[in-house]
């Protein structure tokens, strides 16, 4: 929806949007708490309340001590005993604080982790139960990854120790005021009048910053979507040298984030500055008022002073609770889309379960349009009967609606009118899981999950036995290649099955459907990816499987469906004609006969080919995949140049370009920090003046109040400078690091993306989390460090000047205070890295299941996915309990030492006064300054291990940035005046992920300039590996590959790829318009060039028929287009590039016969005077090639033109032809 251009309307709309920013109530975040969580929260709350209330109790003792010490010059001996007694009370109080703070942290951390895990599972469960149409129109994989990576972490942060922290401060606030009113109500009342101003300043800051943070997060979602899509289609991006364009898009998406982040920095500076401004003015008022209370004898100096301290610190607790409130608000906003999804009403999927399934399917007056394109009518009053136990074939043009009929039977979509019936029952009223449980589906583009072959087959039947799995693999002819794998069924297939060839993926996909033993079988080009020999065997296996089952086959190759009981020609939203093969060909003017004639004309010499063959994605053509062991042994081996350490200097070098901002921020931080000890000195001076004569008290109070008023103005300025400059620096760092990481990812060779740890979901997740972590360490923590450094330096200078003896004693307790903090931090840090890795695996699983949602729901695998997801969350959940216990104990110990040290300091101060070595004034001033210092000293030094060990937390950032690609391409010569002669000379090659498996050994191939070379052979023989080597997706282990006599390793990589066009078997489109997808072939091409390319690829007519034409969005991974439409867009993209060398990997495989004929003609024109390498299973498409090479086991076993090769009747090529001809006549 585009915003209005009217500024007034825009402002009103923005204000309204800000006002109505959606969020959920805070209590709703705890919706998933069970009884055990409630017990944990109750115990944690009790601990937090006792911990918070202990501080005001401390001030009661403190007030009595002050009074004793203040009057010690009258009765020194007696005073010393009393001080010792109260100092011991401090120790008892410290023990209470130890246990209560442990309970607070341990319980809240554990319950937070437990509840967040349940929210994660509920979110994914809801996602998996949504209607498929939602994924066409509203939800992207990037959105899901962002929600699970970031948003739920924000919620987890808000429902764990942050709640304990908040209750701690609130109980301190309540207890402080209660004790204050009981002690000196007059002072408490004046203080109470100030608290609303403090709370208001904190509240406004929290509200503004939370609004900006929501906007920042929304911007990140868009950037995440771009990253996930680009990395997922990295082969296409690299083949079309689109890396810079991708980085530019990503940077554009991040620019909004940067703008909002800068505003958040300014808001934080003004917010915290205003908070301190109010505090300074409040203290000036209170010091003056307390002096009057003491003068009039309402209360003594110690009591009055500690009441004032107590009430102000209680008020301050509201300020300290403000960041927690901000976290709660942020979580409420972040949780809105999550809970909205969890509670989203899906249509009731329960229903009747039939006792027996015959398999009669009826389309009754079915009208249908896709939700994403409601203007385009696919079916209008469609009526069709699929009898039980029969094989029904659907044929017709690409985009005619064949696959849509399968989607309607699977109930991926509901008809807009009419009904789909099963055995006389409207399938809308049948239980959805039960329905899908009786249907087996094999798609044209097989979808596998990044797990083992065994697990992939078990998606068909979760409790399948080893025997059932093996039998299914035998039936699909997958067993032969699986047995050749080092790890057999336990072999990892990689993201989207990338480690396997297309034929191997399809066979596993068929095994998955077979193991299900369904009543209804839906085959959408099920044998399309197989070579002729495998196809024959698999087709026979499928024929056996089809017996007695209702089977619906979608096919472009008519030869595959000759024996179907019924063949239906789909077109124009209706069934044009139907009948058996013999019945249909008896009508020479019929649609089927017309299609048959077109196909026969395409391959007269071969009498047809039966398959819609597909070879593979352009790389892992071979039969061996990456195994878990080989990943660690080999794939990671080149990356062993990991930096063992990332120095602090290296961390800070990242912000060198922004040193001016850093300098201003450092100055602001140092001044802001140094204000606190000076403030404490002013308060201590006021306290001392309460024990002097009235005139002296008045003068001192007046002087201190004026200084505080000046300080209030300075604090606003320095806080604004500090947070604005560091905010800008932090956002610039994040922007720079994300951009560098993204560029570094795209710089890597294709082999790097084959690794299990480098899937698109995991890398997109890392881009989001790692850059933010680096910013937190380098900028956010440095801000606190510098501020507290200013505080500590100023405090020690003042303390040593005032009373060096007392300072040294207090300083001696600091190691104990700090050790607790440091231990806690180191302990937490040790868990941090491992936990983030555990979540990465879970995030990858979630992203993968959403991107393959159709396969998941078709196989009723939602529960399987959720079980796997739960297992991935088990480790962080188990660790959270131990982590919470240790963190709680260490936190409690550090609190114990802090309060015990106060008792020691006051006791020692009284001894010094007793011996006449110190005055009351110097003791109180030193003590007050050191109290403030001790409160933050632990925090400062606890940051040190984070900064020093920051390399462990962000090492992955630098690993990525420092990694040298194994295919170096930024040096070398430019390739110009390309003639196009390709030569592979003595090539030895094995994939980096499986170095033990040799693909080529002394492989030689020459493709003369301007000639076409076809590569044929069985699936997994190495055909697509040739294309991958020419494109330099991989480098050979030995031998050279030359273009026009130049070693391609000595050429600039982008220069090489600019002259090569690629069309893959599974076309990779981007989630943008058709126009933008075609334009990807040639940046800056004119509109007429784009349209001409579309016409050549036979895409213009179907594009023009769409309501939005070339502006039609193709959806994530081109899901809104049919397979044939996607392929034609991909061909148009290659046509537009107009390359000297053309690589076609089953370029016409997804097209119907009519489209294929026209596109083949277009490709023939395109191939003229151009060096072309064609990979094909279907021999009819390559009979006109200048040369044909038959590849088997990584070697060329026969080579020549079609006419020469067919003369050798016993040759491999002739055998392939006769096999396909036999299939044509006896399918």
Curated annotation (Swiss-Prot):
Binding of ATP 2, residues: 1017-1024
Tissue distribution of the protein: Expressed in the sieve elements.
Regions that span the bilayer: 38-62, 90-110, 169-188, 194-214, 269-289, 297-317, 663-683, 704-724, 784-804, 806-826, 889-909, 927-947
Domain of life: Eukaryota
ABC transporter domain mapped to chain residues: 361-597, 982-1218
UniProt cross-references to PANTHER family, sorted A to Z: ATP-BINDING CASSETTE TRANSPORTER (PTHR43394:SF11), ATP-DEPENDENT PERMEASE MDL1, MITOCHONDRIAL (PTHR43394)
Protein name: ABC transporter B family member 10
Organism listed in the record: Arabidopsis thaliana (Mouse-ear cress)
């Amino acid at each position: 929806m585009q915003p209005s251009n009217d500024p007034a309307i825009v402002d009103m709309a923005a204000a309204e949007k800000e006002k109505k920013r959606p969020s959920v109530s805070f209590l709703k975040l705890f919706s998933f708490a069970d009884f055990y969580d409630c017990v944990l929260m109750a115990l944690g709350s009790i601990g937090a309340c006792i911990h918070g209330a202990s501080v005001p109790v401390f001030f009661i003792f403190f007030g009595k001590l002050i009074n004793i010490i203040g009057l010690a010059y009258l009765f020194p001996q007696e005073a010393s005993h009393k001080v010792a007694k109260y100092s011991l009370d401090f120790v008892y109080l410290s023990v209470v604080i130890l246990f209560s703070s442990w309970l607070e942290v341990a319980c809240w951390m554990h319950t937070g982790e437990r509840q967040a895990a349940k929210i994660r599972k509920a979110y994914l469960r809801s996602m998996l139960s949504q209607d498929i149409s939602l994924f066409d129109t509203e939800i992207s994989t990037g959105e899901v990854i962002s929600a699970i990576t970031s948003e739920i972490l924000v919620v987890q942060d808000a429902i764990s120790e942050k709640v304990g922290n908040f209750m701690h401060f609130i109980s301190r606030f309540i207890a402080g005021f209660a004790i204050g009113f009981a002690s000196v109500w007059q002072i408490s009342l004046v203080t109470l009048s100030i608290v609303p101003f403090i709370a208001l300043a904190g509240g406004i800051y929290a509200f503004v910053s939370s609004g900006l943070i929501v906007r920042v997060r929304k911007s990140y979602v868009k950037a995440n979507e771009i990253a996930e899509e680009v990395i997922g289609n990295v082969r296409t991006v690299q083949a079309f040298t689109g890396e810079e364009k991708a980085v530019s898009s990503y940077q554009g998406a991040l620019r909004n984030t940067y703008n909002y982040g800068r505003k958040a920095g300014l808001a934080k500076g003004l917010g915290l500055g205003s908070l301190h401004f109010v505090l300074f003015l409040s203290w000036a008022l209170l010091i003056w008022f307390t002096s009057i209370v003491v003068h009039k004898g309402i209360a003594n100096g110690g009591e009055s002073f500690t009441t004032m301290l107590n009430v102000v610190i209680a008020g301050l607790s509201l300020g300290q609770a403000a960041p927690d409130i901000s976290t709660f608000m942020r979580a409420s906003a972040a949780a809105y889309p999550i809970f909205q999804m969890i509670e989203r009403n899906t249509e009731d999927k329960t229903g009747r379960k039939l006792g027996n399934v015959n398999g009669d399917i009826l389309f009754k007056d079915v009208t249908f349009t896709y939700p994403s394109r409601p203007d385009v009518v696919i079916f209008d009053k469609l009526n069709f009967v699929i009898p039980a136990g029969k094989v029904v074939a659907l044929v017709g043009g690409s985009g005619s609606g064949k696959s849509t009929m399968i989607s309607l039977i699977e109930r991926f979509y509901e008809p807009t009118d009419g009904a789909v019936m099963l055995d006389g029952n409207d399938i809308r009223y049948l239980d959805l899981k039960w329905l899908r449980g009786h249907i087996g589906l094999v798609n044209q583009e097989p979808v596998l999950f990044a797990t083992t072959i065994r697990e992939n087959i078990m998606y068909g039947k979760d409790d399948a036995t080893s025997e059932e799995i093996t039998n299914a693999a035998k039936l699909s002819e997958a067993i032969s290649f699986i047995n050749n794998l080092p790890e057999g069924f336990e072999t990892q297939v990689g993201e989207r099955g990338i480690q396997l060839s297309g034929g191997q993926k399809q066979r596993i996909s068929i095994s998955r459907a077979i193991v299900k033993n369904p009543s209804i079988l839906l085959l959408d080009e099920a044998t399309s990816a197989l070579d002729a020999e495998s196809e024959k065997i698999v087709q026979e296996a499928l024929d056996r499987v089809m017996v007695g089952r209702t089977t619906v086959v979608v096919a472009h190759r008519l030869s595959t469906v000759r024996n179907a009981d019924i063949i239906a020609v789909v077109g124009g939203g209706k069934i044009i004609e139907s009948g058996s093969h013999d019945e249909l060909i008896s009508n020479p003017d019929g649609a089927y006969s017309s299609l048959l004639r077109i196909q026969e004309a395409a391959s007269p010499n071969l009498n047809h080919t039966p398959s819609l063959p597909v070879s593979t994605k352009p790389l892992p053509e071979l039969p061996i995949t990456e195994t878990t062991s080989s990943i660690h042994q080999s794939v990671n081996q080149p990356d062993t140049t990991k930096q063992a350490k990332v120095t602090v200097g290296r961390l800070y070098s990242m912000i060198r370009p922004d040193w001016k901002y850093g300098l201003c921020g450092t100055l602001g931080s140092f001044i802001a920090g140094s204000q606190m000890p000076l403030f404490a000195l002013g308060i201590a001076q006021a306290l001392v003046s309460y024990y002097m004569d009235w005139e002296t008290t008045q003068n001192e109070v007046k002087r201190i109040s004026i200084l505080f008023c000046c300080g209030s103005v300075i604090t606003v300025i320095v806080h604004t400078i500090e947070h604005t400059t560091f905010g800008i620096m932090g956002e610039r760092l994040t922007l720079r690091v994300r951009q560098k990481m993204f560029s570094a990812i795209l710089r890597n060779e294709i082999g790097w993306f084959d690794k299990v740890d480098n899937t698109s979901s995991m890398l997109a997740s890392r881009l989001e989390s790692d850059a933010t972590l680096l910013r937190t360490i380098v900028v956010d923590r440095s801000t606190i460090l510098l501020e507290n450094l200013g505080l500590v330096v100023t405090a020690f200078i003042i303390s040593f000047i005032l009373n060096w003896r007392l300072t040294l004693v207090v300083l001696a307790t600091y190691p104990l205070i700090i050790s607790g903090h440091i231990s806690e931090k180191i302990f937490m840090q040790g868990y941090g890295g491992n936990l983030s890795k555990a979540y990465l695996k879970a995030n990858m699983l979630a992203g993968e299941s959403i991107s393959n949602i159709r396969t998941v729901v078709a196989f009723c695998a939602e529960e399987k996915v959720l079980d796997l997801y739960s297992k991935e969350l088990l480790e962080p959940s188990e660790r959270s309990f131990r982590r919470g216990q240790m963190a709680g104990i260490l936190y409690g110990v550090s609190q114990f030492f802090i309060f015990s040290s106060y008792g020691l300091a006051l006791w020692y101060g009284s001894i010094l006064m007793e011996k006449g070595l110190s005055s009351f004034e110097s003791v109180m001033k030193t003590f007050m300054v050191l109290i403030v210092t001790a409160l933050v000293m632990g925090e400062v030094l606890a940051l040190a291990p984070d900064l020093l060990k920051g390399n462990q937390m962000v090492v992955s950032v630098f690993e990525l940035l420092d990694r040298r690609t194994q295919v170096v391409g930024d040096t070398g010569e430019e390739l110009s005046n390309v003639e196009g002669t390709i030569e592979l000379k003595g090539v030895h090659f094995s994939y980096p992920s499986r170095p033990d498996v040799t693909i080529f050994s002394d492989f030689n191939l020459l493709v003369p300039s301007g000639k076409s070379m076809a590569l044929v052979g069985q699936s997994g023989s190495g055909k697509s590996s040739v294309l991958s080597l020419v494109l330099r997706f991989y480098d050979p282990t030995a031998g050279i590959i030359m273009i026009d006599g130049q070693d391609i390793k000595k050429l600039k990589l982008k220069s090489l790829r600019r002259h090569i066009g690629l069309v893959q078997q599974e076309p990779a489109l981007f989630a943008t318009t058709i126009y933008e997808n075609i334009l990807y072939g040639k940046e800056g091409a004119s509109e007429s060039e784009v349209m001409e390319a579309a016409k050549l690829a036979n895409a213009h007519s179907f594009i023009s028929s769409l309501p939005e034409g070339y502006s039609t969005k193709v959806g994530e991974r081109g899901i809104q287009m049919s397979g044939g439409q996607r392929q034609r867009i991909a061909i148009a993209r290659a046509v537009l590039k107009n390359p000297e060398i053309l690589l076609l990997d089953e370029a016409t495989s997804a097209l119907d016969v009519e489209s294929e004929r026209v596109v083949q003609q277009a490709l023939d024109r395109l191939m003229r005077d151009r060096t072309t390498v064609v990979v094909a299973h279907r021999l009819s498409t390559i009979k006109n090639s200048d040369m044909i090479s038959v590849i088997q086991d990584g070697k060329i076993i026969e080579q020549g033109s079609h006419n020469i090769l067919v003369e050798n009747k016993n040759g491999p090529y002739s055998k392939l032809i006769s096999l396909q001809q036999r299939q044509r006549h006896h399918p």
